[in-house]
């Protein structure tokens, strides 16, 4: 029985082992998604783990950090199946533990190799992008659009071609969000010899246009690839697969192009995926803005403030002063060791320069102390610091002049004063200098960037070198002091600087005496300070200035005491010289000796006249120089665009487009009051003349330019006023009320310059006749914002639908006139085509003026509106030139057309004016369906017909 206790102990030990193994298995299963623990007895020694290079703590995933980033310092996670096997297995010996650690190490290496492989793939794709560029100057410019965008190619001989100008006039600023929603990009080609060129117009998701120049060598290749005909206008619409979807030999309305694109099945998916795209695009507020883009993907847009805006390829505009997401840059800071002795309170002044992300250029800055202490400057080796910043700052370096002694040079950096880095360094600097009134001598160290900054009391004097001034000459308004704490600045520091370069030493003394006479030398803003600013802007005088600094900074007090006496003597001497020169000039004036006066004018210019009075006169002079000898001007002022007198005058000259063009008239219209105005310039030109662009768009709202132009011609009234000038820009006639253009033309024909033009135009055969071949653009411009067009097309005048439509139009002259409707009839097929234009008076009278339309114009109109000549069709064109509704079958009653017109916003304003004037048609003529109210019988009788034709109203808002 002695074996019983031993048996019981063995059973207990076995049960303990079994329970322990089950508990370990449950913990392993429970921790499959959490932290996996290994019993302490089965863990490898820490030294072995360190030697193997894989720690269980690092390999086990953490709940707070389940995913390891690529650039993280933590090793990547091992595969889940390996860890699961390790948690379930029970190691029984050291060999088992060693094998487990080897497997974990292999798993870590496996993940690391996957990570390296993934990075290699991205590097390969980047290298592919470098080897196969897709810029506008590369041969595969079309390949950059493949699979992503539709391409709309416009080809024209040159930019002044009539069809091209008409097509570009249809591309208003509010259409680019529609184009971006359909993934349309534009390529413009000019293929005439000598004017070959082009541009790629990339439309961003915000409706902005990034224009990239196209290599002229690619023009013939693209023309042959797209099968475009040379010497003619043509357009091609390409699918996303770069296959030709549609060809257009004439300009077409954008709705016709949208209709072709929207028929593709992929458009349904695009619409579902891009819900609200157009609203978001228009809300960005940059639709239609054109930005010139270079081929590297970046773009630069000039702004009126003088700086530059950097725009990325995605269309994002960065701020002019700060740019985000800047790469790591290496900047070199020169740290001079400065020894300064001074007692007044310090003043800190910083100048922030405009941001440019292309390059960092150096500018020279010298800060001069008011008390002129003795300074010893020792330049140390340059130290390179590398850091990454979110707000871009332009560092200013100070290059030491070539002189043995300099007055307190400093290396300062323009920083972002709102960044936490600057605040922290500012606090460190203040803690490092508790006693600012004592002299501080500091040795620059490599560890701290700001330790070399010696705070000394200064009356700041900043003068730039020629290089820096040429770069920032237009950016004076951008150099603002955002941290202005200089409380002791006297008014003398804000005086305008002199720009005259002194020629001789005696003249330099005279300049100094003038400043000494104006300002008190005992004040911090010393006369020497102003003298330094005046001379410091001229690079050849830097040596003399440094010598002057050297002479002024010597510690001998004797010279400082003697200086006022010398200044008084030189001042008296200068006055004597002036008096002698003046008397000598008066004596020699009768002998016509202008040498002395010219020398004096060179020595003593009037610096205040040029910078303030010259630019406005020069701007107006430049504006008028464009027209002088070439064009005649009609200048009109009006308080607002919808002024009644202005609208009447505008309609007058728009009706006489050809006569205005033959007389070379340009119209400058100024809207608004004397203090707040905008300007518009219209040039009336013949088809063979190149389009003119006199000034940029920002100059059209230049208040100073408009004010000077008003004063130049005496147009200082806020009411309607009109001025007529000849080619010499001299006023010929004033008009205070609208005038018929026939009387204006009769007056112009009496000008001597016009008589010569008439003789020359008669020899060249340039005349304006009603049957003269006119372009589609000039024809449509007659009706834009003045008349609504009802275009009726039929294969012949015997067509049944055409005759039915004519029956419905009979007796509607009054309704057509009050609604400003003009009927345009296009008849015929093939070569036997023609047309008739019927004009109805706007006062509602029954008289009708008819004009014949030539065959070439009928063909152009049908091509423009995409009208088939083989079938009957009728369409309504609004005053804005857009098609409002299509009618493929005759309308038995014009009530439906009147209903659509009367719902337009512009028509409602017309109705209000006509009702106030009592203008209406008799009830018996229009049968009760005028613009006042519908007769109940017509309302019920044509309700079904309206529903039938409702599908042809394409949902236009007006």
Swiss-Prot record:
Q: Where is the composition biased (Basic residues)?
A: 495-506
- Give the top-rank taxon of the lineage listed in the UniProt record for this protein: Eukaryota
Extract the ranges annotated as region (Disordered): 30-99, 290-335, 358-396, 424-452, 467-617
Composition bias (Low complexity) maps to 358-389
Q: Where in the cell is it found?
A: Secreted, Extracellular space, Extracellular matrix
* Signal peptide start and end residues: 1-21
Question: What is one GO cellular-component annotation here?
Answer: basement membrane
Q: Does the keyword Signal apply?
A: yes
A Gene Ontology annotation in the biological process aspect, one of them, is:
extracellular matrix organization
Q: Which InterPro entries match?
A: DUF4174 (IPR025232)
Q: Mark out the compositionally biased spans (Basic and acidic residues).
A: 425-438, 471-487, 547-589, 597-606
> Which keywords does this Swiss-Prot/TrEMBL entry list?
Extracellular matrix, Secreted, Signal
The task this protein performs is described as: Promotes cell adhesion and matrix assembly. May play a role in eye formation.
Q: How does it assemble?
A: Binds to various extracellular matrix proteins.
Protein family: Belongs to the CCDC80 family.
Q: Which PANTHER family match?
A: COILED-COIL DOMAIN-CONTAINING PROTEIN 80
Name recorded for this polypeptide: Coiled-coil domain-containing protein 80
- This chain's source organism reads Gallus gallus (Chicken)
